[in-house]
A protein has these predicted regions:
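A short helix-loop-beta-strand connector motif used in the catalytic cores of GNAT acetyltransferases and
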Residues: 46-55, 74
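Short, His- and charge-rich active-site/binding loops that engage polyanionic ligands
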Residues: 58-90
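Short amphipathic alpha-helix that is part of the acyltransferase structural core
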Residues: 1-43, 54-56, 63
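Acyl-donor binding region in acyl/amide transferases
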Residues: 82-172, 176-177, 181
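Short, solvent-exposed loop/turn elements at beta->coil junctions and helix N-caps
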Residues: 39-46, 162-165
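Short connector loops at helix/strand junctions that flank enzyme active sites
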Residues: 50-52, 64, 92-97
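Residues in well-ordered beta-strands of folded domains
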Residues: 3-5, 56, 70, 100, ...
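Charge-rich, low-complexity intrinsically disordered segments
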Residues: 101, 169-234
Length: 234
């Protein structure tokens, strides 16, 4: 089983936090060469704090994917970090969350023989399921153009709120990710098409997914240097 669950910052064990921040350093600094802060072979920043919740995808005790959620009423990267890259950048009032630091560790995926499973679709679904479980109205994130295409190909009906230009003069986007039942069903249908097993509780949170062989993930995140949920820290 691949298990998806959430932990808040204060609930992270020392072992789990070291594993998470080490994987983030490998992804965002070593692989993508983002302008991020690293110490002791780990990547973390001021947004890793008591207001933060992490989504984990875990298989056989190892983290294979993760992302970070912060309620938009608290300081977040959209307003504090990325505002200079947009002519206008405003988040609507309401019960929303910001997503950042999303990654899928492809080395672990290969080592655990999971590359034939729709990991990225499951991670996207876990975002919806988590948000729905707590009554959030939607998710916002800053993404690159290639990442926007990945979301669109997944079937998730994300929308562009604002368009900006990064410090590398590349297009970046503030997007809204709906968490309604319709979009949840779209992703579940897509997952079932690729892995037609008896996964009857895909709308649940926490989320567990029964794995099998000979299924491909066409929407696996490709670790090219274009960034995922952002372009880097200032």
């Amino acid at each position: 089983m691949i298990d998806f669950f959430d932990l808040d910052y204060d609930s992270l064990s020392q072992k789990r936090s070291a594993e998470l921040f080490s994987l983030r350093k490998k992804t965002f600094k070593d692989r993508l060469n983002w302008r991020v802060s690293c110490e002791q072979n780990m990547e973390f920043d001021v947004y890793d704090n008591k207001n933060t919740t992490y989504i984990f995808g875990v298989y056989e005790g190892s983290i294979i994917c993760s992302l970070r959620f912060i309620e938009t009423r608290f300081p977040n990267m959209i307003i504090d970090t990325f505002k200079p890259y947009f002519t206008q950048l405003h988040l609507p009032e309401g019960n929303h969350i910001e997503a950042s630091r999303l990654f899928i560790d492809k080395e672990r995926i290969r080592a655990l023989h999971l590359q034939q499973h729709p990991i990225s679709l499951l991670l996207f679904l876990s975002m919806i399921n988590y948000a729905r479980s707590l009554g959030y109205e939607g998710i916002y994130a800053i993404v690159s153009h290639p990442m926007l295409i990945i979301f669109q190909r997944s079937g998730w009906q994300v929308s562009i709120v604002e368009k900006g230009l990064s410090e590398k003069h590349q297009n970046i986007y503030l997007i809204h990710m709906p968490v309604d039942e319709h979009n949840q069903h779209l992703l579940i249908k897509h997952i079932n098409k690729k892995s037609p097993l008896l996964n009857n509780t895909l709308n649940a949170w926490p989320l567990s997914f029964c794995v099998r062989e000979n299924r491909s993930d066409q929407f696996q995140l490709d670790p090219k240097p274009y960034g995922m949920f952002g372009i880097g820290n200032t």
